């Protein structure tokens, strides 16, 4: 869990910040 509107909040957030997005 950590996907919030395309924002991955957590440790990988720094690596992935646009999942729901293009």
Curated annotation (Swiss-Prot):
Kindly state which reaction or reactions the protein catalyses. a short-chain (3S)-3-hydroxyacyl-CoA = a short-chain (2E)-enoyl-CoA + H2O
**Top-rank EC class of the record's enzyme:** lyase
What is the superkingdom listed in this entry's lineage? Bacteria
Annotated GO biological processes are: butyrate metabolic process
The catalytic activity of this protein is classed by the Enzyme Commission as 4.2.1.150
Cite the entry's keywords alphabetically.
Answer: Fatty acid metabolism, Lipid metabolism, Lyase
Associated pathway: Lipid metabolism; butanoate metabolism
**Gene Ontology terms for molecular function:** lyase activity
What additional remark is attached to this entry? On the 2D-gel the determined pI of this unknown protein is 5.2, its MW is 30.9 kDa.
Q: Which family does it belong to?
A: Belongs to the enoyl-CoA hydratase/isomerase family.
Q: What is this protein called?
A: Short-chain-enoyl-CoA hydratase
């Amino acid at each position: 869990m950590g996907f919030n509107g395309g924002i991955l909040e957590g440790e990988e957030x720094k690596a992935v910040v646009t999942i729901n997005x293009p």
